[in-house]
C-alpha cells in the first residue's frame, strides 16, 4: 500500500531479514535518528557547560512535551531509562512490612515479577497471582478476577495495560476504580501501550504508570 510504503521509506532497514519484533526495541526513523545523533554531538561539543547550564532546561522541555503526549501534568512525570526502572522505583519505594500482600498476574513482565520476589525475600511480602484468561467472556470477568485476589492485606496491585505475550488490552480504568473502592493503589505497566493505543493516563485513574519511549514510539 502507498501509505505503508511511505512509512517504510522513513526507516533505513537491513534488507537481509524482516523484523517482526518491535516491542523489545524499535527502529528509529532516519529523521529521529539524525536528531538523536545531533543531540549527542551537541552535548559532546558543550561538555560540562551543557551538563551544568543547559541539561535541566532541555529535560524540562522534554518532560512537558511528554506530559502532553501522555495526558498528565509535567509535575507528575519523571524521566527514567525504561519501564522496568520506573516500576521498580515504585515497588522498592513502598514501606513494606512482613505479611503485606501484592497482587499481580502470571502474564506480567518477568522483570517485574522478579522485583516482587525480591520484596518477598527482603521484607516478607506475600505475592498473590492471578491468571488472565486468553479469551475472557467480558471485561467484567477480568475485573472480577483481580477483585477476587484482593484482601484486607493488599498494599499494591500491579496490572499490564497491554499483555506483551498475548496482546490483550486490559480494562485498566475499571480495574483501578474497583481497586480504589477497596483502598488499594494500582501500578500499571504501560510498556506496550504507550504510543500504540490512544489514551490519556489521567483517564485511566491509576496511581502509577510506567512506559518506555524506545518501543512503539520509535524514539
Language-model regions, residue ranges each:
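Pyridoxal 5′-phosphate
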Residues: 1-219
Amino acid at each position: 500500500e502507498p501509505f505503508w510504503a511511505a512509512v517504510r521509506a522513513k526507516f533505513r532497514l537491513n534488507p537481509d531479514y524482516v523484523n517482526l519484533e518491535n516491542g523489545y526495541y524499535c527502529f528509529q526513523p532516519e529523521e529521529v535518528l539524525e536528531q538523536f545523533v545531533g543531540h549527542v554531538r551537541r552535548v559532546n561539543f558543550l561538555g560540562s557547560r551543557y551538563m551544568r547550564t543547559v541539561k535541566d532546561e532541555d529535560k524540562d522541555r522534554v518532560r512537558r512535551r511528554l506530559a502532553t503526549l501522555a495526558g498528565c501534568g509535567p509535575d507528575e512525570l519523571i524521566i527514567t531509562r525504561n519501564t522496568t526502572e520506573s516500576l521498580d522505583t515504585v515497588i522498592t519505594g513502598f514501606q513494606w512490612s512482613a505479611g503485606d500482600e501484592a497482587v499481580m498476574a502470571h502474564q506480567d513482565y518477568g522483570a517485574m515479577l522478579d522485583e516482587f520476589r525480591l520484596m518477598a525475600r527482603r521484607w516478607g511480602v506475600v505475592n498473590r497471582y492471578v491468571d488472565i484468561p486468553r479469551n475472557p467472556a467480558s471485561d467484567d470477568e477480568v475485573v472480577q478476577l483481580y477483585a477476587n485476589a484482593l484482601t484486607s492485606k493488599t498494599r499494591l496491585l500491579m496490572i499490564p495495560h497491554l499483555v506483551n505475550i498475548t496482546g490483550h488490552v486490559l480494562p485498566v480504568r475499571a480495574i483501578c476504580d474497583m481497586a480504589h473502592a477497596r483502598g488499594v493503589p494500582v501500578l500499571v505497566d504501560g510498556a506496550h501501550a504507550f504510543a500504540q493505543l490512544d489514551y490519556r493516563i489521567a483517564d485511566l485513574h491509576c496511581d502509577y504508570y510506567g512506559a518506555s519511549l524506545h518501543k512503539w514510539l520509535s524514539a
